[in-house]
Amino acid sequence: MNRLLDRLTQNGKFHPMWIVLAVTGVLIVASIVFIPARYEGSKEPKQKIAVADHAAAETLPEPDAGQHESKPEPAVIQTTHFTPPAERDMPTGEMGDMIKLGRNIFVHTQVYAKNLVGNGLNCVNCHLDAGRKADSAPLWGAYVMFPAYRSKNHKVNSFEDRLAGCFRFSLNGTPPAYNSKEMLALTSYSYWLATGAPTGKELAGRGYPKLDKPPRQPDAQRGAAVFEKNCAICHGADGLGTKVNAQYAFPPLWGKDSFNAGAGMHSVKNAAAFIKANMPLGKGNSLSVQEAWDVAQFVDSHDRPPDPRVKK
């Protein structure tokens, strides 16, 4: 570079090469100043954006946060596990006698309350193991939840009202008088089964378990196949029950000796839940959800005594 400058300045005259050198010098200086400035400038917006994004993340609500605040989670029903007293612990004396009578009426309704029954059923046909079995509407689970409002009759019911309804609809008969020995005995038996259970608390196993909706619409034709395979051996191919010594060993599921159209079991939803949890007898929960709904639909498709509340 020094030699080039010497040659350009030897004669003291202007040389075109001066222009090239001047432009080159300007470009070099500009690059020294511009490149760091550009580098610094390119970082600043990114930093500002990052800070802005971070601030937004701290101030903006999470997706659906407003929905969670405006729609609180539904209350979860807490259940308490309970085991009824063993029959060997049934008390003695007059109270014990009344409790035993209540059990006999419950299990052998056709014998001990025959004049109040209008079909071939016993209470134990729907409330298994003498009203003790969980998930088959056990007496101990019902007793502690009354008095209670029931949408079925649109009023607050006593436990005696609930028992009366069973006689009227499930047994297609006449409710016992509220001051009768039958009513007192059944109430005493229920009271004893609930010994130690907390009043007003939802006990695990009360009523029938909640059953999932079926994958497909319940179908009576599919249900007929389920019935033939799993139910007919006990309830008969015609569904009219099986008798031993003039008494039903296995109850009729439809026809004149079955529950009437006002009974809770006439609801396909209730019947499906009962069947899923308890049927075939001794093999509860062996049917699929779909099978339980289908066979309940099949049972419900048959004729039975009318609901006494419906005027002819």
Protein language model regions, located:
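Sequence/structural segment immediately N-terminal to covalent heme-attachment motifs in c-type
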Residues: 94-130, 214-250, 268
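Post-cleavage N-terminal segment of exported redox proteins
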Residues: 2-103, 109, 147-220
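Extracytoplasmic electron-transfer domains, predominantly the class I c-type cytochrome c fold
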Residues: 96-101, 105, 133-176, 186, ...
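Short sequence/structural segments immediately N-terminal
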Residues: 43-45, 89, 116-121, 132-133, ...
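Secretory-pathway/luminal and periplasmic proteins that interact with or process carbohydrate-rich
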Residues: 112-114, 130-136, 193-198, 233, ...
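Detector for the c-type heme attachment site
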Residues: 124-133, 191, 234-241, 254, ...
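Surface-exposed patches in mature extracellular/periplasmic domains of secreted proteins
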Residues: 110-118, 174-181, 199-203, 283-289, ...
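Amphipathic alpha-helical interaction segments
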Residues: 121, 125, 181, 185-188, ...
